[in-house]
Amino acid sequence: MPSSTLIDHSPRNPNPSPPRITASNVILIDNYDSFTWNVYQYLVFEGAFVTVYRNDEITLDELIAKKPTQLVISQVPDTRKEDVALAIEPLRTSVAKSPFSACAWESCIFYSYGGTVDVTGQILHGKTCPLKHDGKGVFAGVPQDVPVTRYHSLAGTHGTLPDCLEISATIPANADAEIKEVIMGVRHKEYVIEGVQFHPESILTEHGRLMMRNFLKMQGGTWAENERLQKEAHAQAIGAAFSESAMVQRTDSRTHLQKIYDHRRAAVAEQKKIPSNRPVDLQAAYDSNLAPPQINFPERLRQSPFKLSLMSEIKRASPSKGIISLSTCAPAQARLYAKAGARPISVLTEPEWFKGSIEDLRAVRQSIEGMANRPALLRKEFIFDEYQILEGRLAGADTVLVIVKMLETELLERLLGLSDSVGMEPLVEVQNTDEMKIAVKLGAQVIGVNNRNLVNFEVDIGTTNRLIQMVPKETILCALSGIAGPKDVEAYIKDGVGAVLVGEALMRASDMSQFISELLGGPYKEVRASSSSPIVKISGTRSEAAVAAVEAGADLIGIILAPGLKRTVTAETALSISEAVHKTKKPNVSKSGLLADSKTASDFFDHGASRLLETISRALLVGVFRNQSLEYVLEQQRLLNLDVVQLHGQEPIEWAKLVPVPVLKAFNPQDHGIGTRGYHALPLLDAGSGGSGKQLGLSDVKAAFTKDDGIKIILGRGLEPDNVQTTLAGLDEYRDRVYAVDVSSGVEEDGQQSLDKIRSFVKAAKSL
């Protein structure tokens, strides 16, 4: 017998919630419906104290006298007006502060306010349908297209929707129906009255308990009053969470955390309405594989050049310190952090109090594109919605922050599950033993302890040490906030803390590398290029000069494969040169000092240079192309076994990712895209089309360096044996950023390559 595909959402092994103060006197009216006690079960599991009355066992006056916190009226087996009269009467007299029905109550609400209920034109009894909803009221936090089980085939009609009601949920109608959607939920615009036309308590309805929980949180007779009371309750809960031994007395003033939380909820709700920013738009982008490549966050934390891992942070302001630096350039700061040894970089994306945005995250991700062993990117935000996780992933985040203090356990578990489903192991933030227990129980691999009290912003760096014994050995524990100097870190190293987050202190450090080394018990030095000897490229090489150039110590041998140029070689000659270069040994082999360290990040151009300087016993063969088709370039690379491809025309920069070997791209210093990371291994700065011997002004070269302090180049500017040393010396402090020199006409006599000039040029360049 085939296995069943039935998904059972019933609470067979329930985890009952503690008693809920807001639901201390729930009255459930049983309209002789068979599902009443299923509804009762869900209400009780969510912490409600429920009393059940048959509709003919209690009068309206008696019901009013009992002062229920909520009134739930069960499904009505028949929807004729005379059969729902008992259900309508309590609603009309506004006895309950938050009336709610599991199914037919939508019909009752329609009848009560003058609407019409009619057949839907399709048989729906007992069927499951994907539900679309507005995310408010009972649907807060409920995913879209959640499967729900229908009660019957009747529903309120669109044309008779009372003015005082709004549609809160729908399901798709039949393709041949006159309407596109069947109404599945309605809500009173002013009063706290909600109704649905399906079974939240059904085993086939997903997130039914969440809907019940949302309902039981509702207070007050109007939505305005409910919002006020909920905000006060949330602020009180957050304040109470900071005390492990006593309840914090409730106050009317909201905490800073609550203010930020409320502001972000409202802002995200509005953002989700914008075309291109809607949840469906983000999901479509993710399904189209538009999220950038990611790395494993826990593993990156373990790969540190220090005794523990450094977590850096980019933020322009904070609630505790105010404005830090509004002029901070997030992508530039990220490159500094990465090369200084930071393993993750935390990017604040909250705009109001931290002056960040999701665009900061996207720009930072682009700035470290192509870095070898790049740091992981953390989206630091007040995460409360799956939408924010997907938004962060699409912007390039490798991980996200989730704060236990802000989230109920079920929502927290759901957010962790979604984060895992998109390949991101989150950083779970806690501050006390209760929160740590939750994080450990949910299996968090990386737990951060916030040393800062989020209510009064006081810092106690001992908070992390007090909680470390609760953390499983395989879990990485991070100390967050309040770390300013080496003494703050010493105890963490001794106790086995895996990482520390340093924010303002690092951003304000005058010498970042020195500060980090002293803070984390270095030593650590940023990987830099050696200025002693640039690599040498001989271009326009013909057969007779190839072997001589290699034997002289040249590192790169360039052959011109673009048609119509005076140094272009034939296919036969190109094959001959390829064979000679691949067989001829270099006189001296030295290991590059630029080879990437697996525990540190290196700029893309440092990595590009290391690929050209890696330990190898022969020179590398470079094929030079100009404005030829990509197909031709790929074919020649394969036929000639080219080690490197040089694009010397107007070829798109993106081609570099389509060529299976390192690519050099020629630029004029005024061109755009010279410093674009992730494509060409190194840019070649040249004055003209190549081989012209035209001088390239050093001021232009320096200007290119000034625009991008991480750019490294190959210099080709009319060099020759007599001027290569003086030219490089003329670059002053930028000398180290010339990784290679390229010569063509400078080693020729009467249009022919001179073997003596080749030897002289290599000797002069290697003598630097």
From Swiss-Prot:
Keywords: Amino-acid biosynthesis, Aromatic amino acid biosynthesis, Decarboxylase, Glutamine amidotransferase, Isomerase, Lyase, Multifunctional enzyme, Tryptophan biosynthesis
Enzyme active site: C103, H199, E201
Record-level Gene Ontology MF annotations: anthranilate synthase activity; indole-3-glycerol-phosphate synthase activity; phosphoribosylanthranilate isomerase activity
Keyword Coiled coil annotated: no
Keyword set includes Amino-acid biosynthesis: yes
Record domain Glutamine amidotransferase type-1: where: 25-225
Gene3D superfamilies linked to this entry: 3.40.50.880, Aldolase class I
SUPFAM superfamilies named among the record's database cross-references: Class I glutamine amidotransferase-like, Ribulose-phoshate binding barrel
Enzyme Commission number: 4.1.3.27, 4.1.1.48, 5.3.1.24
Binding residues annotated for L-glutamine, in chain numbering: V76, P77, D78, S153, L154
Pathway involvement of the protein, from the record: Amino-acid biosynthesis; L-tryptophan biosynthesis; L-tryptophan from chorismate: step 1/5; Amino-acid biosynthesis; L-tryptophan biosynthesis; L-tryptophan from chorismate: step 3/5; Amino-acid biosynthesis; L-tryptophan biosynthesis; L-tryptophan from chorismate: step 4/5
Region (Indole-3-glycerol phosphate synthase), start-end ranges: 256-520
Coiled-coil intervals: none
Biological processes, Gene Ontology terms: L-tryptophan biosynthetic process
Job description of the protein: Trifunctional enzyme bearing the Gln amidotransferase (GATase) domain of anthranilate synthase, indole-glycerolphosphate synthase, and phosphoribosylanthranilate isomerase activities.
Listed PANTHER family: INDOLE-3-GLYCEROL-PHOSPHATE SYNTHASE, TRYPTOPHAN BIOSYNTHESIS PROTEIN
Protein name (record): Multifunctional tryptophan biosynthesis protein
